[in-house]
Every structure is written in C-alpha cells, then in structure tokens.
C-alpha cells in the first residue's frame, strides 16, 4: 500500500482526497489515506471517510494527530473524536475499512509508561484496527523487542515497521 498523509506539509485535505482518488482510479496501487482527529467534528471527519469510501478507498491510517501549529499539547476538538481508538470505532460504523494505527517502539512521548502505551495500542486494535504502523526507530533490536512486548499483551495484528527514507545524503 501507499500511505498518503492528511493535509500535511501545508497541503489541503481536498488535495489528499484527490490524490487517493486518483491512485484508486488510475493505478494498481492501494492507497492508505491518513485521517486524524485534529481540528474537526465527528460529522466532518465522518464525511471525509464517506467520501474516501465512495471513491473506492478501503484502507485508512487512523491517527489522533499532532497538536495544531502553535499549540504545545493536543486538545480534542469539541464534538470531535478524542483519540485514535474513537476514530477507529467511528470508521468501522461507516464502512468495513482496513484500518492501520500508529505504534511506538520507543514509546509515545506523551505516554505515562511503555506499558501504558501498549495498553493504548491494544485498545486501538480492539476497537477494530487491522494493523499497526510504527514510528521510525534506529535499532532493529528495538523493533524486535517491541513485537515481543506486543505479543505478550495479546496484540497479534501485523505490525509494519515505519521507515524514514534518506532524502538528503549530505545531512
């Protein structure tokens, strides 16, 4: 699959929709459209998901999302999905999406502990996610230990290692 971010880097959400719709219509690639909880009501997020479904998009990467520019911490939008697990449940009500969620081999920076972070991942899986995609990491052993910890928690969905491609060899 090809992961397509949601309004990242200053692009619009409409541009993201156009991109994934074109991937479905014009290529043999399977797009995984990112969808976040940030800055929108449930109805607005649900409408985006319905448009993805109507365009033939069947794979969503459901993320809480980062705080908006200028904000130091995440605050749920009034009337919006509070967390990724809520978004996963909402998406499952709309369609039988394949849903990927974020995972953190080195623990999410806002997590109270590594164990609490795994509990949160388990809730996202139990809500209906079919796969986890990790943040990037630098040591392969970190990923292998993470997989072992996931299995010990009863998390048995595929876990895809996130990679950060080198885009500037001089850096």
What are these regions (language model features)?
Residues 1-18, 65-79, 130-146:
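Glycine-rich, proline-tolerant flexible connector loops at the mouths of alpha/beta enzymes
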Residues 10-33, 79-101, 144-163:
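Alpha-helix-loop-beta-strand connector modules within alpha/beta enzyme cores
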Residues 37-54, 78-82:
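Glycine-rich anion/phosphate-binding loops
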Residues 2-4, 31-35, 60-62, 99-103, ...:
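Hydrophobic faces of well-ordered beta-strands that scaffold small-molecule active sites
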Residues 31-43, 98-116:
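Active-site mouth loops of central-metabolism enzymes
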Residues 16, 42-50, 112-123:
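Short, acidic/polar
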Residues 53, 125-126, 151:
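Non-catalytic positions within long, well-ordered alpha-helices that form the structural scaffold/packing
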Residues 162-171:
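Catalytic-face loop-and-helix region of soluble metabolic enzyme cores
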């Amino acid at each position: 699959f090809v992961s397509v971010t949601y309004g990242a880097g200053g692009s619009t959400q409409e541009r993201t929709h156009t991109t994934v719709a074109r991937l479905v219509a014009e290529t043999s690639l399977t797009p995984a459209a990112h969808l976040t909880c940030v800055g929108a009501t449930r109805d607005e997020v649900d409408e985006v998901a319905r448009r993805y479904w109507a365009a033939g998009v069947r794979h969503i990467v459901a993320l809480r999302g980062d705080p908006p520019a200028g904000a130091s911490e995440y605050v749920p939008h009034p009337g919006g999905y509070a967390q990724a697990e809520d978004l996963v449940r909402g998406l499952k009500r709309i369609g039988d999406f394949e849903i990927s969620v974020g995972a953190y081999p080195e623990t999410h920076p806002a997590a109270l502990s590594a164990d609490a972070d795994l509990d949160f991942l388990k809730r996202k899986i139990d809500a209906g996610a079919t796969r986890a995609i990790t943040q990037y990491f630098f040591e392969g052993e970190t990923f292998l230990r993470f997989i072992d910890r996931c299995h010990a928690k009863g998390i048995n969905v595929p876990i895809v290692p996130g990679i950060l491609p080198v885009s500037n060899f001089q850096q």
